[in-house]
Amino acid sequence: MSRTLTSRQAEELHKSIIAYLAANNLQDSANAMRTELGLGEDAFDTATAKKYETLLEKKWTSVVRLQKKIMDLEAQTQTLQTELNSATPTSNRRGDPSSWLPAGPPRHVLQSHRTPINCVAFHPIFSSIASGDEDATIKIWDWEFGELERTVKGHTKAVLDLDYGGPKGHTLLASCSSDLTIKLWDPANEYQNIRTLPGHDHSVSAVRFIPSGAPGAPLSGNLLASASRDVTVRIWDVTTGYCVKTIRGHADWIRDVSPSLDGKYLLSTGNDRTVRLWDISVPNPEAKLVMIGHEHFVECCTFAPPAAYSHLATLAGVKKPPPASSTAEFMATGGRDKTIRLWDGRGNCIKTLIGHDNWVRGLVFHPSGKFLLSVSDDKTIRCWDLSQEGKCVKTVEGSHEHFITSLRWAPPIIKDKGPGEETNGDVGTPKKAATAPQDVQIRCVIATGSVDMSLRIFSR
């Protein structure tokens, strides 16, 4: 013992052991040890025993805590090493946007909401971001500077979803609510409410502007899709306020909708545990595919961008990926079964991503197509590498202090846009982005909203 402990440390240990034995009614053992060590009664009185009787237990629990911390740190080190190994030699977290992934701490923690945040949406051009909450308010922020710009009021119940888009040259903000309405706001006119769209018979869960360019759609750029607890998807003309199509097929609450990049297809998910793909370019849309596999309500859905086709084709066992000009080739969904599922254009589940410990609430593909990001009620952001068979290569722990309800990636910056190109109504991407990626500059900024009432910005 003398080889590892000093004389004073050894004496402290001996006294602690004697006091522990005495405190646990092992007096004979305590007396024997005291005798062996030559400690008389005067050297180990009642006051000394009281001082040392809990010291051994405290030391023991401290060791256990330290062991746990060491194990946690080793796990974090392993995760970081995995990230490092998966990076290309020339990639740089700060220099290569195609490999950038969010990391803590956030750039900004935006706080002003008084109730849980349900949704967030980036302006396609300016550094504005909107967030909606349970107390019927929408807040507009400058995500670049982390400042609140204004509070927008008009709904009478919880704001459930938000999206920027609309006719070319006239960006609008759409919001939907538990008050059964959709409202359109004009960012160019101090976010005045320019139109209210009634028609749904229950809470409106999701809204998405449909990108321009849908074949056979004379109102391209003017269309908005909505999903509701009334078990319908509706398509609206935002210039007139009329519902131009009502889509039925789900058997329960529809939670989310997502349009394809060309505006021809619409993806929907809900409480009936199905994922449905609709061709909305025809007068009477019918489900082209019904995908079944989730074991609980399906919370979110999104189409994969063409940049992800090569990785997803490999997962699907396809040697040649689909052409970048095609759409609705691959999709991703997340649900309350804690899983993310990747689907091909024939309705086959090509991969199930497991890792979250609670409901999956939001999904977004990395603009490079290599990664898929997800958020969950387990308070984490997870990054899945599609080039490594969907392996989780990064987990941003403690991203929020409560459930994470929403996730968005900032729209790209369009450079040297040529004549004839149009911006995507949702994120400002051009129709030709798939064939001319050099014109698109990735913005390494994501936003998350949470039940903890904060909006957080993660950026490079």
Curated annotation (Swiss-Prot):
Classification via InterPro entries: Dynein_regulator_LIS1 (IPR017252), G-protein_beta_WD-40_rep (IPR020472), LIS1_N (IPR037190), PAC1-like_LisH-like_dom (IPR056795), WD40/YVTN_repeat-like_dom_sf (IPR015943), WD40_repeat_CS (IPR019775), WD40_repeat_dom_sf (IPR036322), WD40_rpt (IPR001680)
Residue intervals of the LisH domain: 9-41
Name of the protein described by the UniProt record: Nuclear distribution protein PAC1
GO biological process: cell division; establishment of mitotic spindle orientation; microtubule sliding
Coiled coil segments of this chain: 61-88
GO cellular component: cytoplasm; microtubule; microtubule associated complex; spindle pole
Region Disordered, residue ranges: 82-105, 414-433
UniProt subunit comment: Self-associates. Interacts with NDL1 and dynein.
Origin species: Gibberella zeae (strain ATCC MYA-4620 / CBS 123657 / FGSC 9075 / NRRL 31084 / PH-1)
Pfam families: LisH_PAC1 (PF24951), WD40 (PF00400)
Subcellular location(s) per record: Cytoplasm, Cytoskeleton; Cytoplasm, Cytoskeleton, Spindle pole
Family: Belongs to the WD repeat LIS1/nudF family.
Protein function: Positively regulates the activity of the minus-end directed microtubule motor protein dynein. May enhance dynein-mediated microtubule sliding by targeting dynein to the microtubule plus end. Required for nuclear migration during vegetative growth as well as development. Required for retrograde early endosome (EE) transport from the hyphal tip. Required for localization of dynein to the mitotic spindle poles. Recruits additional proteins to the dynein complex at SPBs.
WD repeats: 112-153, 155-195, 199-246, 249-288, 293-354, 355-394, 399-456
